[in-house]
Amino acid sequence: MHRRDFLTHGLASVLGVLGMPASALAIGDDDRFTVSLLKYSQQGWNTRPTALRRLLQEVEKRTSVEIKPPPDGDHVTFGPDLFTRPMLFMCGESSFEPWSNERIDMMRQWMMAGGFLVVDSSEGVSDGPFLRSVRRELARIFPDEPERAIPKDHVIYKSFYLFNNDQHPYAEPHGRVEVDKRLRGHFDGDRVPVVISANDMLGAWARDGFGRWEYDVIPGGSPQRELSFRMGINLVMYALCVNYKADQVHIPFILKRRKWRVQ
């Protein structure tokens, strides 16, 4: 089952609880895939406004996924629009106030219905104020499921490009910086509804209107930026289905790319 279909069936009842008609659920109106930023507070939620458009351009160029490019800074807030997005990014570099219980419940419902959240810190450190605030809220959403490192054999690392494997052990998650060589997250069985990166992937993707990279990538330069794009593409491909069979995921793509090298 596609994640889009799963969200459509699973969230009609949620909209009813919110007092919204089923027609408010826009999933399915446009089969093209898109992602947005989560506006989680009044300030500091949009530190990398150009990044997602650049990522989706690469997704469309390298895969068969049809993309609906978002405008720079496209976002959703806590409310019915949340349930029109199968995948959201959350970025920042400063702390934010605790969410209300209603917002915690809404995020939990969205994730448990198939929503996929990627948290990407712009801070360049492993335990800055943004990530501390995020972890505070995720602990409320997942009180019985602590954050942990995503194992190297998880399908996220092979949904399109191969990472963390014997042939390419150097190919690890990267971003604008190298803070943590592991992605982290919370699990719902085998599924990972939320991924946490401290490496500022969005900073590596951000490009201005003249085509210039907005941030230097440290320490690896262009190869590190390429690995960051590949990780982003893997995350998008993971978001497109509710569950993957680890031994069958995108076999034609994987066979084609088993000998890839970063130039």
Question: Each predicted region: which residue ranges?
Answer:
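Alpha-helical scaffolding within the catalytic cores
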Residues: 71-77, 100-106, 179-181
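Short alpha-beta junction capping motif
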Residues: 35, 87-131
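N-terminal signal peptide c-region/cleavage motif recognized by signal peptidases
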Residues: 21-23
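N-terminal secretory signal peptides and thylakoid transit peptides that target proteins
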Residues: 1-14
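Charged, often glycine-rich, active-site loop that binds/positions anionic groups
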Residues: 82-92, 160-169
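Aromatic-Pro/Gly-enriched surface loop or interdomain linker
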Residues: 25-87, 94, 201-202, 209, ...
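An acidic, glycine-rich "communication" segment
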Residues: 32, 43, 124-229, 233, ...
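Extracytoplasmic/secreted envelope proteins and their assembly/folding machinery
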Residues: 49-56, 104, 108, 131, ...
